[in-house]
């Protein structure tokens, strides 16, 4: 049976040190019957060494490919109409429900939405009434741009993005990409009551902490992140701490 939505996790061996937390938190919070695709570079000698769950569908990409080509490589093997996409350092900290994700996909399909970001910002919520989700205090908001992840993409739109555009992972939100997405029907979802304090950690569809920004730990933004990583015996002392990345809310 073809799932309505699947999860695609893009990874790189350079950040494999974060995988224990990603896998542990996914095992803890994501419903077991969610289809998960794990995309990693072919320079890794033994993926089994990293204890990636057996039921995750594993794909490799060639290291010399640009980011959009790496991701585009896997679309033919994903059959779901919608894809929840994230990179390896966006760590879930709350329930990731298959039922809720499927209900959200139904809303997207009924309204011809192409993309739904898992959180928003008070600069958006302060200027719109929003559309009630059916879940207390959570509303959908129209967006005129995109933040790449974690977000639900219509499969065909995500594939078009990665086919038409030729981008590195540091360029996938540049002006050309923003212009492309402004021609699509893009939305966001947010808890209106907590948008000023907890917009990513209180996400309806993928509560999370973004562990790394520009290669530095996001301990300033997420004070509880270090304790979480320490619980997975991840070395948090070998790189610095980011001091300014989106500190207005968690």
Where are these regions (language model features)?
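Conserved donor-nucleotide/metal-binding helix-loop-beta segment in metal-dependent transferases, i.e.
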Residues: 94-124
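C-terminal catalytic/acceptor-binding lobe
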Residues: 164-250
